Structure formats: C-alpha cells, structure tokens
C-alpha cells in the first residue's frame, strides 16, 4: 500500500473555513484540532493524513514534498513565490485584499518611500513594477503603528473591513491584489499520485460550486 497523501492546512480562519469543504469532499478529521495538541491528524480516509501548520509554512512544506497538497492564502503564496508547486483550485474563502495604506491626507513623499510590511517580496516587486524606489522594512505585526511613529510612509497589509486602519487614522490607497484561499500541489506528487490527487481536487471544486450555489 502506498503511503498516505498528506494535506497541509493553515491554522486559524482558513482552517475553520476549509474543514467544511474537505468534509464535503469526503475527508473529515477524526478529532477536533481545537481540542488537540497533535500536529498530524488521521481522517475518515485511511489514505489521507492532515497536518496543521502556520500559513507561511504551507508553501515550503508542499514545495519540498513534506506535504502533497496544501491550503494557503494567495497572499502567502505571492510572498513565497510559488516555486515547485501547482495552484489548481481557488477555494473562494477567507477573501480579503492586499493593499497599500497611508495616513489620511499624507503628503506625497520624495523619490524614496519607506514601506513597512510582512510581505517584503510582494512590496519590493510592486514598487519595482511602478518604477519607484522603496526601502522595505519587515515587521511581524501591528503594521498600522509604523506610519504613526514615523517608521514608514506606507504599509502593505491585508485589509478585510478596513476598520483597524480607520481606527488608527490610516486609509487604503492602492490595491495590490484580491486575496482568497488556494489549493497548491507538489509538482512531483502531481505526477506520481495524479489520479488520487486529481480526485480530491475535483471533489473540492464540486464542494466550492455547491457552497456558492447556497
């Protein structure tokens, strides 16, 4: 018997919204991950295991073959670069926007911007495409604070409702990308386990369509 397929799921909001889709596709965890300290979970299918990890770890796990399939936000995939993986399915969940934001009524800066973000690669590529020089400062949280204390002119961050920005005197100024949750697949696994993986992908596509239909 071949080894089980491994699916890597992102912790947090994406996990909560992904589990019902997997259930509809015939894959259900045998125990509640919220009540367990486990990292590897058995499922209702003997040939499928699930690991639950940080969102930013999903792409490298799939890229290097530690997981055959992964589920992560498009923002994480953009930052990672997508090397070594296919991105065949948009689950259309955890939707938001990746945006540039600045202080309200902020004056135009000079030729060089200072930008705070955890999406360093995305920010550098975005400003390079615009022909603008930008010093990108990597932060890990509370991006809204950076313009308030003069650390940065702009931030690049995920925006859902925009309430946190407005509460701190900031406003979104430029849209970089619409974000949703995607399924990624290891390139080698897609060749060696094509039938098994494609069956799961097809069922997920059906589950997404059914969810949209209401």
Swiss-Prot record:
It comes from the Bacteria. GO terms for biological process: L-histidine biosynthetic process. It is an enzyme of class 2 (transferase). SUPFAM superfamilies: Periplasmic binding protein-like II. It is found in: Cytoplasm. GO terms for molecular function: ATP binding; ATP phosphoribosyltransferase activity. Pathway: Amino-acid biosynthesis; L-histidine biosynthesis; L-histidine from 5-phospho-alpha-D-ribose 1-diphosphate: step 1/9. Gene3D superfamilies: Periplasmic binding protein-like II (3.40.190.10). One of its GO terms (cellular component) is cytoplasm. It catalyses: 1-(5-phospho-beta-D-ribosyl)-ATP + diphosphate = 5-phospho-alpha-D-ribose 1-diphosphate + ATP. Keywords: Amino-acid biosynthesis, ATP-binding, Cytoplasm, Glycosyltransferase, Histidine biosynthesis, Nucleotide-binding, Transferase. HAMAP family: HisG_Short. Belongs to the ATP phosphoribosyltransferase family. Short subfamily. Lacks the C-terminal regulatory region which is replaced by HisZ. Heteromultimer composed of HisG and HisZ subunits. Catalyzes the condensation of ATP and 5-phosphoribose 1-diphosphate to form N'-(5'-phosphoribosyl)-ATP (PR-ATP). Has a crucial role in the pathway because the rate of histidine biosynthesis seems to be controlled primarily by regulation of HisG enzymatic activity. This is ATP phosphoribosyltransferase.
């Amino acid at each position: 018997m071949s080894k089980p397929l491994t699916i890597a799921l992102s912790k947090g909001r994406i996990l909560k919204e992904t589990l019902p889709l997997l259930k509809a596709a015939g894959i259900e965890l045998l125990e509640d991950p919220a009540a367990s300290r486990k990292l590897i979970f058995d499922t209702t299918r003997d040939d499928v295991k699930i690991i639950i990890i940080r969102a930013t770890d999903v792409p490298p796990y799939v890229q290097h073959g530690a997981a055959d399939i992964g589920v992560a936000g498009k923002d994480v995939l953009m930052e990672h670069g997508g090397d070594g993986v296919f991105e065949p399915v948009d689950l259309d969940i955890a939707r938001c926007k990746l945006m540039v934001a600045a202080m309200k009524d902020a004056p135009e800066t000079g030729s060089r911007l200072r930008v705070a973000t955890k999406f360093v690669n995305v920010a550098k590529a975005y400003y390079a495409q615009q022909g603008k020089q930008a010093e990108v400062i990597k932060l890990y949280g509370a991006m809204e604070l950076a313009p308030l204390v003069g650390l940065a002119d702009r931030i690049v961050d995920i925006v859902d409702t925009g309430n946190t920005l407005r509460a701190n005197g900031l406003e979104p100024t430029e849209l970089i990308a619409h974000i949703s949750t995607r399924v990624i697949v290891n390139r080698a696994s897609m060749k060696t386990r094509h039938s098994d993986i494609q069956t799961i992908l097809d069922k997920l596509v059906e589950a997404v369509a059914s969810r949209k239909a209401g």
